[in-house]
Regions:
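Allosteric cytosolic regulatory segments
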Residues: 173, 177-185
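A short, aliphatic-rich beta-strand micro-motif
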Residues: 138-149
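Amphipathic coiled-coil signal-relay and dimerization helices
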Residues: 68-77, 85, 106-108
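Signal-transducing coupling segments at domain and membrane junctions
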Residues: 110-139
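Acidic/proline- and glycine-rich, intrinsically disordered low-complexity segments
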Residues: 82-112
């Protein structure tokens, strides 16, 4: 019994260490995003770091298109094509569904139709992208990027495939929510006139959305 208790305590300690390391890494990433005036260039630099943070293979960040009915990829890791992906805001794709429902999804296997239908009867994975690239997507962690003061949808962050083949953890789920909030602030700053950025940021700090 003592051996079992010791084993459980050791496991809990290791889990706490992993969680702390993850949160420290996440804070470093968010600090860099807050400090930049060029979010597009920074995210290209940070894409590998974000993948490392989530122990993931690939990352895609979408922004809402000018038509407000679609999302367009702005950052893509692991794809040789430079052409942006444009997806309708609908259940026709997982990222599109997240944009439509504004919900966070942690999918264990995108090819499991039963899992997708348990989320939404119309939800499907765009297998055509895998066929075109030769890549096999399995796990997917996806979150909407929403400007909290206005409740405006700004984009979607999508993280693909854990390197160990396991589902994304609960810590990763919490982390992608924090990352999406940080990206929302960065997107808002990019879309505002220079003179309004400081006021916008101060408003968020005052409302405890972010810490200075």
């Amino acid at each position: 019994m003592n051996d079992t208790l010791d084993s459980q305590l050791t496991q809990n300690a290791k889990e706490s260490e992993r969680r702390l390391a993850f949160l420290k890494h996440l804070q470093m990433v968010t600090n860099r995003i807050h400090a930049t005036s060029d979010i597009d260039e920074l995210m290209l630099e940070l894409s590998e770091d974000v993948c490392g943070l989530f122990n993931a293979e690939r990352l895609t960040i979408y922004a809402v298109g000018e038509d407000k009915a679609s999302i367009v990829s702005k950052v893509k890791t692991g794809l040789s094509t430079q052409k942006n992906l444009r997806l309708p805001i609908s259940a026709q794709s997982i990222a599109g569904h997240v944009a439509l429902s504004r919900s966070v999804l942690n999918i264990h296997d995108v090819y499991d139709d039963a899992e997708l239908k348990s989320i939404s009867p119309d939800l499907r994975f765009l297998k055509e992208v895998d066929k075109r690239t030769g890549y096999r997507t399995k796990q997917m962690l996806v979150a909407p990027v929403i400007d909290l003061p206005s409740n405006e949808l700004l984009g979607v962050v999508q993280i693909l495939n854990t390197k160990d083949g396991k589902p994304f953890s609960e810590v990763a789920l919490e982390g992608v929510k924090s990352l999406s909030e940080t990206l929302a602030i960065a997107f808002s700053q990019r879309n505002k006139p220079v003179g309004l950025i400081k006021t916008k940021y101060d408003f968020l700090v005052a409302d405890a959305v972010v810490s200075a």
